[in-house]
Amino acid sequence: MKKILITLGEPAGIGPDLGVLLSEKYLDKNTIIIADPTLLEQSAKKIKRKISLNILDNIDSDLISGKGCINVLPVELNIRNTPGKLNPKNAGYVIKTIQLAAELCKQGYAGGMVTGPISKSVLNKGGFKISGHTEFLADICNCKSVMMLMNKKLKIALHTTHVPLDEISKYITKRSISETVKIINHDMKMKFKIKRPKILMTGLNPHAGEDGMLGKHESRILEPTVRKLNAEGILIDGPVPADTAFLKKNVMEYDVILTMFHDQGLPVIKFDNFKTTVNITLGLPIIRVSVDHGTA
């Protein structure tokens, strides 16, 4: 079994606590946490848990397992961490953990990576102009990525991710929509083993434009793109009004619902089942999954 790498995200947030708590019953011998060992020790003391750290020299070092056991591939903090107090001086540390995990996955040393929540504002204040894991990993892997959140009932993909609302329309083009749909279609086949994925696309505007009265994006961009994708053999319907896209019959019929922007899709799936929803990045040559909550 290939190794699974975990990054804890923002050191002053809940990520280190989750890493410690995971060691009590979920971590197995093939799981490695990439972090500063002192961070895990600090967290264990804070939440009153006993842990045993196995600090690795490299990815091929011998691993241990058992309650409280954590295999740690060390990356040193830039500055001492204070729980609950975000510090941009540790932004570089956060970036290093993500980069290391991604590179080890790219090189085949690990089968996938699980990421803890980051503070995007702290990273930017620390000099790293990134808007999120999804975009950063796409840059590392030199490819386009698509954010998808899923649980047992729903798979919701986003065409745009961390983009201000007044800028979203700039990203709604025939080419970009086509790229997003093709990534979803490919990964549903290859990673989820769905032979003929069915995708439902929402419109951008209220009522999916209402025949152009409430916006032209649907008639000028989305509808022609859907027709072209259908002609290429991709099973996609839409655009449909976002307010009815998540009716039970649609959730049952379609494998994925593609929304145009962040807050068009995420509130639905988080309301449905926040605790069991995970974030998966499609389009990457590696496997990356994440929690769907913030740094707390």
Located regions from the model:
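Contiguous, glycine/small-aliphatic-enriched amphipathic segments in soluble metabolic enzymes
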Residues: 1-132, 175-260, 264-279, 283-293
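Flexible loop/hinge segments that line or gate small-molecule binding clefts
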Residues: 128-164, 286
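Active-site glycine-rich loop that binds ribose-phosphate moieties when present
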Residues: 135-143, 163-189
